[in-house]
């Protein structure tokens, strides 16, 4: 069963283009292309993990240009029997940022009893094409109180992004304002049965601790390598964090196809 619900991403929910930008050919407007990426997947096997995610999968970039991550739709499904206890926090991370509170772009909390969940994130910031090719985004996942034997996959996540590719810097308005996601906030994005730990510990603090632990392990590994003169492959550590300053909304609006799509444009 596919994780993503059939249907199209509604680009107008992320980007507010002017009438002129919609009507004029691309050669007469700074907006060259609004695109939806291919679906990227993460299979979560560890309780705490920091995973690479390709939010620009299938997106055609412009040399010496920019790409704006206007919006992101995340769909998750618990691979568990009904009415299991526990829950998860999912956080989008910009790995370029060294301060943990600045690296966390937004977070979402839900319980394992919620079999399938979906939320929307509005990062609305641009990076250069050169940085984009380095795959700068990660996903921090923290699962608590889910009792499953090691080596199995309790949770699957899928990601589809809406981005704008252009040569020159532009300013685009958003149809919705950025909000902090908390239980009882302006948008109800958490379940009542979610464990209290998810609200008590900010994801930025979890990210800082995770980075500190993995950094120490990396130093120990380097010391062993120099003494044994033998290379040791790096493990792909994963983690979860708190989304500060992002707007999420439950909405069934992802495309299940594996192809990137282009909208509101005729050329690059």
UniProtKB/Swiss-Prot annotation:
Gene Ontology biological-process entries: transport of virus in host, cell to cell
Region Disordered, annotated ranges: 212-247
Compartment(s) where it occurs, according to its Swiss-Prot or TrEMBL record: Host cytoplasm, Host cytoskeleton; Host cell junction, Host plasmodesma
Ranges of biased composition (kind: Polar residues): 225-237
InterPro entries in the record: TMV_movement (IPR001022), Viral_movement (IPR028919)
Record's signal peptide: none
tRNA processing as UniProt keyword: no
Keyword list, A-Z: Cleavage on pair of basic residues, DNA-binding, Host cell junction, Host cytoplasm, Host cytoskeleton, Host-virus interaction, RNA-binding, Transport, Viral movement protein
Origin superkingdom: Viruses
MF-aspect GO terms: double-stranded DNA binding; RNA binding
Recorded GO CC terms: host cell cytoplasm; host cell plasma membrane; host cell plasmodesma; host cytoskeleton
A Pfam family it matches: MP
Family membership: Belongs to the tobamovirus movement protein family.
Task of the protein: Transports viral genome to neighboring plant cells directly through plasmosdesmata, without any budding. The movement protein allows efficient cell to cell propagation, by bypassing the host cell wall barrier. Forms a ribonucleoprotein complex with viral RNA. Binds microtubules and modulates microtubule stability. Can bind double-stranded DNA. Triggers host hypersensitive defense reaction in incompatible plants harboring resistance (R) proteins.
Subunit organization: Binds to host RBCS at the plasmodesmata; this interaction seems required for viral systemic movement. In resistant plants, interacts with host MBP2C at host microtubules; this interaction prevents virus cell to cell movement. In resistant plants, interacts with host resistance (R) protein (e.g. tomato ToMV resistance protein TM-2(2), AC Q71BG9) at the host plasma membrane; this interaction triggers host defense responses leading to programmed cell death.
Protein name as it appears in the record: Movement protein
Organism per entry: Tobacco mosaic virus (strain vulgare) (TMV)
